[in-house]
């Protein structure tokens, strides 16, 4: 791939910008409750208006995740979910799933396979990007060109505690979009969001042309509207969706996920 401009993630953001809309980006844990349900949920989210999806690869020590997503990862691992099986499931949806899928994985599983092989396998399965929350910037700068060769955007994270100089460097290095963590700490729902994030959205947009998506702590319609009012290009909703899915009966998980996504979609437009 010659540049990030031609990536499916970049193209989706460009389309949304022309339409004056914000990207809705749900997160779900692959394999919770099992991979066949995950496949159904991905298609349900697409039908309900999700612009792209973050797909978590379950890991036993998820440092960035709060209790809801940790529990989802534990359920997925108990069900026998492995990175290989996640990619096989994703590959089986080629031809049906047209929205970009961004894999959310910790560095340990990625490094166990090897950066180059992992990126090859992810691209072959149809992924469009990667988020590796515990990967230091220096390692990310090594991984990014490897990912880009396979047509994958390596999305980097910025937190409210990130020093200003480093924030600019991260925004310049991120591909697809910059993932702005809206709160300090782990993922999870929040009733209010740190107002400082609004200033960070604008600072990031000034330091790099790459879109800015806000995640961690977005629990529903009100937060999605708030993020949109700040001028963010995308809103990532994880724990609230995972919790909604966990409380649904097995046969209605995909329908519940789609219903919640539809509610959020209206707020993002």
UniProtKB/Swiss-Prot annotation:
Alphabetized UniProt keyword annotations: Amino-acid biosynthesis, Aromatic amino acid biosynthesis, Lyase, Tryptophan biosynthesis
Catalytic activity, reaction form: (1S,2R)-1-C-(indol-3-yl)glycerol 3-phosphate + L-serine = D-glyceraldehyde 3-phosphate + L-tryptophan + H2O
GO MF: tryptophan synthase activity
Pfam families: Trp_syntA
InterPro entries the record matches: Aldolase_TIM, RibuloseP-bd_barrel, Trp_synthase_alpha_AS, Trp_synthase_suA
E.C. number: 4.2.1.20
One Gene Ontology term, aspect cellular component: cytosol
Keyword Oxidoreductase belongs to the record: no
Keyword Amino-acid biosynthesis carried by entry: yes
Enzyme class: lyase
NCBIfam families membership: trpA
Its biological purpose: The alpha subunit is responsible for the aldol cleavage of indoleglycerol phosphate to indole and glyceraldehyde 3-phosphate.
HAMAP family per the UniProt record, alphabetical: Trp_synth_alpha
Alphabetized PANTHER family for the sequence: TRYPTOPHAN SYNTHASE ALPHA CHAIN, CHLOROPLASTIC (PTHR43406:SF1), TRYPTOPHAN SYNTHASE, ALPHA CHAIN (PTHR43406)
Quaternary structure and interacting proteins, as annotated: Tetramer of two alpha and two beta chains.
Name of the protein in question: Tryptophan synthase alpha chain
Species: Synechococcus sp. (strain CC9902)
